[in-house]
Each structure stands twice: as structure tokens, then as C-alpha cells.
Amino acid sequence: DVPGGLAEASVLPRIAQPYFPQYEPQGHVARSLLEAFQKRTGPGVRIAFVHATSYADDRQVMQFLGDYFEENGYRSLYAAPDHLIWREQQAVSLIQGEEGSVGGIVRFYPLEWLPNLSGRTDWGGYYDTQTPSCNHPIAVFAQSKRLPLIWDELGLELPAWRALLPETRAPEAGKFGDGWIYKPALGRVGEGISIREALTPKE
């Protein structure tokens, strides 16, 4: 298990390929992102790689992507979410010595953390910016563990999801007893998950 796993998913299959000649690597996350930005931005623009800058492992993920983008003619800016402001729905960097316009955004920062930023931070700009963005906030609806609760209302068939995902219920719908796993609607790395049979009385 690695943070994001973007570098590993892009590089490790190619390292392993000589040992498994019957298989061929498929996909390259960094290249796919690059190609998407190439369709929406001009050459040489600056891409902001937004992440939780206090976490070295998050920086490692962004550094991999930033290096790849720079190798292909872009300029990289490593930023915390509150390092960007918005002017006429365009992202602008506030970083000292790196001030100015930003041509694209790759966000590797949990959306539900944005409201915890300083009250002076205009994090709402991430929602309606015209700056080309990867991991747009609208995707949070699909990230929520509560999405299966509204599938029928949305009129979606989703045969693979329905076949593979265990039954999902809202906790407020009642007590379900043993055999259920309780998860926060939004979360990562297993935090906040509760399995009744595995909990100690203190927990």
C-alpha cells in the first residue's frame, strides 16, 4: 500500500515486464494525465501540483508527476491548496517568488479537508475555476461511501458495482447487529472504519 500509488502504477509494470515476457504493461498514469492536459493547455504553461505539503509521501507523488510533466515541456509548481487564489475563475499562485497565473491544476488533497483551511482561504474556487483541473471536486459524489444509497433514484444500472459491492445501508436507518462494517462517508487508509466484533470496549 502506497500513497496514491501513481508512480508505482506507472513505473513498476515496466520494470517487471522483462521477467514476465508473456505479459505487456498497460497504461501509464503520468502519461495519461499529461495527454489530458496537452489537449486543454498550451505548451510550457505552469501546472500546480496541489497537495498537503506537510506530508513527505504526498510530495513524493506530486514530485513524480511534476518531473514527468517537466520532461515533456511543462513547468511545475508544488503548492498547498491555500497557495492558490482565483481571479475571474482562473487560478493564480501566491507563493513568494512563484506568483502569477497557473495553467492547470492537479489536486492530490482530500476534498473534505478544504473547509478546515484558514477562513481566509477561498477554497470554493476549486469548484468553479476555468483553469483545467485533474480530480475536479465534482468527483466527490462518486467518492462517497453513501453513493450506493441513491443509485436507484439516479436510475443507474451499474451492473458491475451491484454485483461486486456488498449491501450498503445508512447507519441512521437502524441497528444492524454483527456482520456489518461501519465506514465514514469520506475517508482513506482505513481510518474511522469500525467492525463491531473487532472493537474493544474502550473503542
Q: What residue ranges belong to the model's regions?
A:
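Domain-scale recognition of functional cores that engage charged ligands
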Residues: 3-203
